[in-house]
């Protein structure tokens, strides 16, 4: 019942999940979408489909700029959708053009601490930006660079190490109506 009310208040607006790699966007996103009766899209999966290769291969063969171009292209298509929860890549916030697409929906920042991200990403060989000798230093630098950009989100959701993804989705659902009320009031004035 509460989900029906939230769906009505959202009026089909997309939810964009942003945050560092390892913050759980691709895990929480489908749960949130299911509870809302929305579709779920993982931008990284779509980028791989468009490119016809894995993200690691895009970085290795074509470079980060090509990956970011594909990311912007895919995000533009996703922003045109409605009733969707979209898990974005961690660096989506780096390009100003991407923000014009993100602002077509509600932007939710899943904010994980450096310690939490380190624990989740240790030994992950699929992420090209993390193939370095000092993972903690690399993650810390990326986090410092991106935090001010993530802070532009409509909602910051601080993550705890022991949180269940389903509980996170539930807490987000409970928070969303409070974000929408001011938007509705502003439109009526």
From Swiss-Prot:
GO molecular function, one term: shikimate kinase activity
Binding locations of Mg(2+): 26
GO biological process: one example: amino acid biosynthetic process
Keyword Aminoacyl-tRNA synthetase: no
Keywords noted in UniProt: Amino-acid biosynthesis, Aromatic amino acid biosynthesis, ATP-binding, Cytoplasm, Kinase, Magnesium, Metal-binding, Nucleotide-binding, Transferase
Residues reported to bind substrate: 44, 68, 90, 146
The protein's enzyme class: transferase
Domain of life: Bacteria
UniProt pathway annotation: Metabolic intermediate biosynthesis; chorismate biosynthesis; chorismate from D-erythrose 4-phosphate and phosphoenolpyruvate: step 5/7
InterPro entries: P-loop_NTPase, Shikimate/glucono_kinase, Shikimate_kinase/TSH1, Shikimate_kinase_CS
Catalyzed reactions per annotation: shikimate + ATP = 3-phosphoshikimate + ADP + H(+)
EC number: 2.7.1.71
Main location: cytoplasm
Subcellular location as annotated: Cytoplasm
Residue numbers binding ATP: 22-27, 127
A family per Pfam: SKI
HAMAP family from the UniProt entry: Shikimate_kinase
Purpose: Catalyzes the specific phosphorylation of the 3-hydroxyl group of shikimic acid using ATP as a cosubstrate.
Descriptive protein name: Shikimate kinase
Organism the protein comes from: Synechocystis sp. (strain ATCC 27184 / PCC 6803 / Kazusa)
Organism placement in taxonomy: Bacteria, Bacillati, Cyanobacteriota, Cyanophyceae, Synechococcales
